Amino acid sequence: MELLQQLLDFILHIDVHLAEIVNEYRTWTYLILFLIIFAETGFVVTPFLPGDSLLFAMGALIAGEHETGLSIWIMLLILIVAAILGNTVNYKLGSVLGAGVFKENNKILKLKYYHQSHEFFEKHGGKAIMLSRFLPIFRTIAPFVAGIAKMPFGRFTYYNIIGGVTWIFALLIGGYLLGQIPVIKNNFELVIIFIAVVTFVPAIWAAIKSRLKPKKIEEIIEGEDTRS
């Protein structure tokens, strides 16, 4: 519970915490953010990391009146690489570990997350890798599911690169350009909440649909295991 409260505080006051990180670590901030984005996209057990709000807030901070010593273009390049590499690692983990890591009683790797991502992947195919970048939870699990489904690596990489570049550019540069507009700057906490709510709505809707139309997810996993 305490960890959840700390995470919520970090998200709601992410601009303050990022400023503290920059003041303390300066250019090491590049590495810190690289590791956060890499972890969120690279490990199926870390879907809770606040990627969207982090990117927007970082862009706004670099554009602010306080000197950070950071370059928006270097940050952009580093985080694009982190996002692409993270998804690639996640894909490889999925191809090796398979669907059996998802359990009904697992608080992080829930069966319903696998089920929702599997449906999303089946519906949109390769585009799911690109579209899921903008959907919390899905962006962490979609490349893992692609690995389980043995999606051709070349096709996966194509959508992975497009999605990674688009996601990082949209939110980081969006924060850089919009973060200093007075109405946004003066209500930054509300903007962060808005970003979090908007990006989580599709995941919440998918969860509701999953409850309204329950399916035997175990059969899906057994089918994946049989094919492997």
Where would I find each of the regions flagged by the language model?
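Transmembrane alpha-helical segments of integral membrane proteins
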Residues: 168-179
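A generic structural signal for solvent-exposed, polar alpha-helical segments
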Residues: 36, 97, 162-165, 173
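Membrane-interfacial helix-loop-helix
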Residues: 2-33, 60-155, 180-194, 202-227
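Transmembrane alpha-helix interface/packing and boundary motifs in multi-pass membrane proteins
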Residues: 34-56, 199
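Residues that scaffold the ATP/ADP-binding catalytic core of kinase and kinase-like folds
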Residues: 57, 92, 169
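Hydrophobic alpha-helical transmembrane bundles that constitute the permease/transmembrane domains
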Residues: 137-141, 161, 165-168
